[in-house]
Amino acid sequence: GYTEPQESEHDFFIIGHTSTSVSLASGLAKGRDLTGGNENIIAVIGDGSLSGGEAFEGLDYVAELGTNMIIIVNDNQMSIAENHGGLYKNLKELRDSNGQCDCNFFKAMGLDYMYVNDGNNVQALIEAFSKIKDIQHPIVVHINTLKGKGYARAEQDKETYHWRTPFNLETGEAKVNDEEEDYSEVTAQ
């Protein structure tokens, strides 16, 4: 989501979510290193945001920095705008080969790489992160997930359920507070 310092003491900046996480985390990692810290710095980025220029710059800098940083790529094959291009072809090759194909964009950039095929399986995630939590160099953890897993409506209509206000789980209809004006009422005024 969006970082907002008033919302969380762990958010240092106000920024949007698209393509910013890796570059932001690289700055935090550099700051940690300059002050002698050793905590894990973790960036989470979706495959839809991965194609942004700022994400590429962040990956490039992290590889050059060579320090402890975990980059989680949540690959749910979903973006509001359809994914196109070589990066997405490579992500598919990596998914299809269980992360083992010879052509690996992340390794080509100089980053270590781990693939988790069932990213909706909590135990698989715990095992993966247990293996790398003390790593002292940058690593990409490529996690293959199913958007909306476990809620049939979200699995079938990824775009509608990409982001939702509170809704009734049984009907999928938005919960509306009767005392508040809805969007249609406000725009009609």
Task: Please place each PLM-identified region on the residue numbering.
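A glycine-rich helix N-cap at a beta->alpha junction
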Residues: 63-81
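Short secondary-structure boundary/capping segments
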Residues: 57-61, 66, 84-91, 95, ...
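Conserved thiamine diphosphate
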Residues: 2-5, 30-40, 85-128, 174-176
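Terminal amphipathic helices with adjacent charged low-complexity linkers/tails
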Residues: 73, 80, 89, 120-181
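Structural beta-sheet core signal
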Residues: 27, 43-44, 71-73, 143
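Alpha-helical scaffold elements adjacent to nucleotide-binding pockets in ATP/GTP-utilizing enzyme cores
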Residues: 57-61, 105, 127-131
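Residue-level preference for the first positions of well-ordered beta-strands
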Residues: 40-42, 68-70, 138-140
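Cofactor-binding active-site loop characterized by glycine-rich and histidine/acidic residues
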Residues: 1-65, 183-189
